[in-house]
Amino acid sequence: MAELKLYPVGIQTFEEIITRNLLYVDKTEYVYRMTHSGGKHFFLSRPRRFGKSLLVSTFKSYFQGKKELFKGLAIEKLENEWTEYPVLHFSMAGGKHMEKEQLERYLGRRLAEQEKVWGITSPAVDANDRLISLIQTAYEKTGKQVVVLIDEYDAPLLDVVHSDVNLPVLRNVMRNFYSPLKDCEPMLRFVFLTGITKFSQLSIFSELNNITNISMRNDYAGICGITKEELESQMSADVDALAKKMGKSREQALEALREFYDGYHFAAQSPDIFNPYSLLNAMAAGCLDYYWFSSGTPTYLIEMLKKFQVMPSEIGSCEADQSEFDAPTEGMSSVMPLLYQSGYITIKGYDPETELYTLDIPNKEIRVGLYRSLLPNYIGMNTVKGTTTIAKMSALIRRNDMDGAMQMLQAYLATVPYCNNVDSEGHYQQMMYVIFSILDNYVDVEVRTPSGRVDMVLRTATHLYLFELKLNKDADAAMKQIELKEYPKRFALSGLPIVKVGVNFDVATHNITDWKIEAE
């Protein structure tokens, strides 16, 4: 077996990856396609840690004419000219968690770095005038049009997207900074902006009316991330090495990777796409884990879920028109655009007749990680004991020991503080939904039957559990409702043994008082 290249985990600079001979999944055909399309202004939205910064860096090396870095890559056979252009590269990644004055100083520092390169010693005061001066200076000194690359253009705004007070203030700062991208158009060769969300009222979208948004185009669907074909061809030896470390066959390793990290689609005709950050971390570590979530759960998403009062069971598994999820974040009537653009739900299907998309949670890493982050909303805190309890519950349920799992859950709930608004069955239903989703089983709530709705359905590899939840009553009352409504008949063709579970919660103790389990 050929010696494997090292993995560029956390490295986002194309030149460093190539010069150090690290693994690079070739995306240069997309670079050539975009730069030779006749367009000038482009925008790409993708979730965090999905390869956007590396893509921007690749464009930078390309426009700097560094042909030697592209040896052996697709673009080497496509490009004949390798013209060098002046490049202004800005990253807004460091502009998070800032007030207006802090953000203005941050932009000033980014501009000062470029002004030093181009010998501007007496810069203007306002950020937009300084950017205009930079573009003019680079254009005049080189005699060539200027390339402007802006990575994570929306980073300063994401943490205040839920705030009606702070968002307009910071948005005006960024609008002022980006405004020259229209005024300087004749001096520009290429403008590329990446981010997570689309803020319609920023000047780049409201004024730059000729910008090309490639975020949902079929021909650019695979521009970021690692496709199934790329994994099995360019990383074939890496898959074999991972399988050996995991003690699995190649097909078993591929299936495990698909279950954990695959499932993203960014267009109606998108290839299967893996999360690149998690995939490379798994290859480097030799094991699967929740790498993307461990790198940080955005607080803005949790805040928006609260703002729109979204129940955990309402996330994913829905149909929507493109305008409902590929939409600006300002004035959102639902959290769907943010969930989609942040990578927590993705396209799973498209019906050309109705022009409706099917959206759902992409994979196991996102499903389990998301519900883990939501759990504190239902138990009041996030504890190590909670994680170990859920792991032990999972083992018990795999052995069909639901009674043992319920005992463990009852003991755990007795140790945690309660939250507000716990005087409804809905609260406990959502808590159970979150907990059992973390166990990585199929869970659904309010499942329709001819005679009513089942509170919760849990499907494991070996059994189908029907839960009825009661508040301040008893487990017998819950079991009687299951039998009276004849819920099991609805699932008779499931092919799995059916188990009925009646559970009662007590408002005073905020815990389970009793439960009853019967096989159908």
Regions found by a protein language model. Give the residues of each.
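Phosphate-binding site recognition
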Residues: 1-424
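Structural motif
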Residues: 147, 463-465, 499
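Active-site metal-binding core of divalent-cation-utilizing nuclease and nuclease-like domains
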Residues: 137-142, 433-461
